[in-house]
Amino acid sequence: MVNAHEAVRPTGLCRTWPNMIGNESAMGTEFRGRINPGHTTILPFTRLQGGPMDYTPGIFETDMSKNASWSKEKMRHTICNQLGLYVTFYSPLQMAADFPEHYEPFMDAFQFIKDVAVDWDTSIYLMAEPGAYIVTARHPKTESLNKSAEGVGNLKDGKKGVVSNAARYVYGLPEDATAADLKGKKAKDVWYVGGVTDENGRVVSVKLDFLKAGKTYEAVIYADGKDASGLVNWAGADDGKYNPQSYTITTKKVTSKTTLKLKMAPCGGFAVSIREK
């Protein structure tokens, strides 16, 4: 498999060569302290038209001096902004790009990275204004998952087989599930919703009318906290409100008639995992 980084021009080669699963070809997360926060709301309409993009999301520690003592930069995003990118950006190989020790204090938020799928059969851009914000809903390739599960679940040594975290979530299996637990299982109806915004905080109303009518789902909502903010200038100075690691996690029952009212902090975002009960 090839996942090319730096300036490889995206021309849709992955459609000809399926082992070309993605490339960067964008100012990725390592530039997050210097680029306009609205950059990530533009890329779905520009760079991503040329194929999958490995943006290396998932940076929870935004103070760059923790990684490089000489740096005074602070990244311009919140934790929930980073979670939202796993949905708004398409890449069949996603990264958890931070140091493991930076995730340890936030394992409840890291759960979304474990649960989110990486390949989709349906993608819906629910609302967007390039340069300002974007909200995307995606549905994993459950038909392919079911075919894989049928084969893997029948392996003689299936109890030794590892089940990916995303597959575990889609099938409603426990954390310690093995390949043998997939036998006879069918994927539940699962959706993921992600949103990110620029330096302006905003509230969006997300209709869940893409869910199956008459079905009840459980939604886990990862949202910016009331005091969250990822807004900071290029020199690393802030207005005293910089609080990128503030977030809330709530669980609620939803249906196709539900509308979620979700707040995004400045440079913030949200992520929602939705699974049929």
Report residues per predicted region:
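Aromatic- and carboxylate-enriched substrate-binding clefts and catalytic-loop regions
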Residues: M1-R76
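Acidic/polar loop patches that form or flank catalytic/metal-binding clefts of enzymes
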Residues: V2-E6, T29-R34, P92-F106, I113, ...
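Conserved, mostly hydrophobic/aromatic
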Residues: V2, T88, V193, C267
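Glycan-recognition and catalytic regions of carbohydrate-active enzymes
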Residues: F99-Y192, D238
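C-terminal beta-sandwich/jelly-roll accessory domains of carbohydrate-active enzymes
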Residues: N146-K186, D198-K277
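C-terminal and late-domain segments of enzyme folds
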Residues: T46, K72-P105
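Flexible loop/turn segments at secondary-structure boundaries
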Residues: R9-C14, T62-M64, M95-A97, E104-M107, ...
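Histidine- and/or cysteine-centered catalytic micro-motif in compact active-site loops
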Residues: A7, P140, V196-D198, D224
